[in-house]
Amino acid sequence: IVPFLLGMVPKLICLITKKC
């Protein structure tokens, strides 16, 4: 579960801040 969360966080930040 932890690796999954670590993979999702950057994607969420990317979507929210529009910085990909």
Swiss-Prot record:
It is found in: Secreted. Transmembrane segments: none annotated. Expressed by the skin glands. The keyword Cell cycle does not apply. It holds the Pfam family Antimicrobial_1. This is Brevinin-1ITb. The keyword Disulfide bond applies. Antimicrobial peptide. Disulfide bonds join 14-20. One of its GO terms (cellular component) is extracellular region. It comes from the Eukaryota. Belongs to the frog skin active peptide (FSAP) family. Brevinin subfamily.
